[in-house]
A protein has these predicted regions:
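RNase H-like two-metal-ion nuclease catalytic core shared by retroviral integrases
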Residues: 111, 197-199, 205-209, 221-244, ...
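C-terminal domain-tail junction helix/linker
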Residues: 213-215, 239-301
């Protein structure tokens, strides 16, 4: 490009071949550039489609190359040729869509060494063949202007859908029970499912165990306190949630607890469950994968 600019305005002296050699540019590449420099960028329609995807939801700008590629495959924008994943990545780099995660949240629950523990029924296998077979649950905290907000959720291992969600300004056992109540109210067929958690006092409490037994759910716990990998999938969900919705987007310390509740509820129930591209689901949002599963059962019947 330097050589082309100089030759166009006539301020360069000497042979072009000399400058090509000095700048380590082949004469063939230089001539090709001259022929194509005024041509439209061949990936412009693809770039426009990517930017449109980012504008659909405020959290879509956190898509990396895999989820962006999956989003393009799912939406199939009219008139846009979808190249391979590596080309998608290069175009993303070109237009500045090169999001990189910055932080990892830490767990906040503490184990009660004296409380009775349940067996580890998951054993780090977070896969499931059908909905409501295996579920995971955990709590995370967020600082607000008027205190801390604790968020408790139950995720389905089959499609990573949020089945139950509850929030409060304390992280007592009642919060986890409320999450379980909400999940069972929405999904009565949760009976018989495995629900895995860490060994926090909330999950070993009598209040929580009574609710587990009432709903006919099988309780599973980490094999030992401090082994974060035993509930790694849930920790990963919190990490993605905070990276996508909070970090670099909202200063939660300037927001009230009630404002955060509204923001988080909308993120999980509306965006996460129904519109967010999920790589673990082959690019399908959780509820889309769930609907496809039940549709396949009807077709088989």
């Amino acid at each position: 490009m330097f050589i082309a600019i100089k030759t166009d305005d006539g301020r360069i002296k000497g042979k072009i071949s000399f400058y090509c050699r000095v700048l380590h540019v082949s004469r063939q590449a230089f001539n090709k550039y001259l022929k194509t420099k005024d041509s439209p960028w061949k990936y412009q329609s693809l770039a426009d489609a990517m930017l449109d995807i980012c504008k659909e939801d405020e959290c879509n700008d956190t898509y990396g190359r895999i989820r962006m590629y999956q989003a393009l495959q799912l939406k199939q924008p009219e008139g846009v040729h979808i190249p391979g994943e590596r080309t998608v990545y290069r175009v993303m780099e070109e237009i500045g869509l090169n999001y990189k995660p910055k932080r990892k949240p830490n767990g906040i629950t503490k184990a009660d060494k004296e409380a009775r523990k349940s067996d580890d029924l998951i054993k780090r296998d977070f896969t499931a063949k059908k909905p409501l077979e295996k579920c995971i649950t955990d709590i995370t905290e967020i600082k607000a202007s008027d205190g801390k907000l604790y968020v408790s959720a139950i995720f389905d291992c089959y499609d990573l859908a949020v089945l139950g969600l509850a929030m409060d300004t304390n992280m007592k056992a009642a919060l986890c029970k409320q999450t379980l109540d909400n999940a069972y109210r929405a999904y009565p067929t949760l009976r018989g499912a495995i629900l895995h958690s860490d060994r926090g006092t909330q999950y070993t409490s009598e209040l929580y165990r009574k609710a587990i037994n009432k709903y006919g759910i099988l309780q599973s716990m980490n094999s030992a306190s401090g082994r974060c990998h035993d509930n790694a999938r849930c920790e990963s969900m919190w990490a993605r949630f905070k990276e996508e919705l909070l970090y670099g987007r909202y200063d939660t310390t300037t927001m009230t607890v009630e404002q955060l509740k509204t923001l988080i509820w909308r993120y999980f129930i509306s965006y996460w469950n129904n519109r967010r591209i999920c790589s673990a689901n082959g690019g399908l949002p959780p509820m889309v994968k769930r609907q496809q599963y039940y549709a396949s059962l009807q077709e088989a019947a």
